[in-house]
Amino acid sequence: AAADPLTDKIGQNVADFLAADMKRGIIPSTFLPLQSGVGNIANAVLGALGRDKTIPAFEMYTEVIQNSVIGLIREGRIKFGSACSLTVTNDCLEGIYNDMDFFRDKLVLRPSEISNNPEVVRRLGVISINTAIEVDLYGNVNSTHIGGTKMMNGIGGSGDFTRNAYISIFTCPSVAKEGKISAIVPMVSHLDHSEHSVNIVITEQGVADLRGKSPKERAQAIIENCAHPDYKQLLWDYLKLAGGKAQTPHAIQALSLIHI
């Protein structure tokens, strides 16, 4: 599917965040290898990074390479792509075969034991960017199940990269089902990536930097920066109801109301 204003905004927020981290010296001026998930949001993120000339041409160390990566290699915005799977359209694949002299020193496919190897991911300082279905107030991520029961997709290699990345980012729209459901929830209905692995949450609303924050500080950052305005007050009310004395406040009796 083509990009739309919502996914474009998420992509731009990711690009702005990475450019800001580079300016602060957290990311070196030469940049770092990126891992990207698959789908519309991932393509929008890569598109935004390709357009943002404050970010230098970069490398991909990822699991799956899609059409968008090939396009950015042709444009010179991606210098090199390493993956274990080339998942592109037939036309794109034919274009690669027809231009093999150009691509032979710009693409490599490795076994997943290498492409997803935790030590390699950590040593290279990979920045991981993956898509969430829902994120809770403390930074736990559900990336596979709708309502905690219906599988949308598998976890793929996102766990390998998220847990070992230099910076781990999750993106999602702030709402689903035409605004009827908030993607920012008090507690995820299914857990794929825990708060200990998630550094940054980005929606079309903004960026929540969770690094170095306590659970309550993470909750405040996520509500303020990532939640949709229609659901912010509800989430603040939940946090207040959960009480202020616990390390990670929850009001279990109220959770079912959020997911209905």
Question: What label would you give each PLM region?
Answer:
Residues 2-95:
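N-terminal active-site beta-alpha-beta segment that forms phosphate/nucleotide-binding
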Residues 19, 29, 131-136, 141-149, ...:
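Non-transmembrane, aqueous-exposed alpha-helical and coiled segments at domain scale
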Residues 53-67, 140-171, 193, 225-234:
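Gly/Ser/Thr-rich active-site loops/lids in small-molecule metabolic enzymes
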Residues 65-135:
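Ligand-binding beta-strand-loop-alpha-helix segment within the catalytic cores
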Residues 120-129, 146-155, 161-198:
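Structured beta-strand/loop patches that form or line metal/cofactor-binding pockets in enzymes
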Residues 193-241:
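A hydrophobic, small-residue-rich beta->alpha segment in the mid-to-C-terminal subdomain
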Residues 258-260:
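Conserved small/polar residues in nucleotide/adenosyl-binding loops
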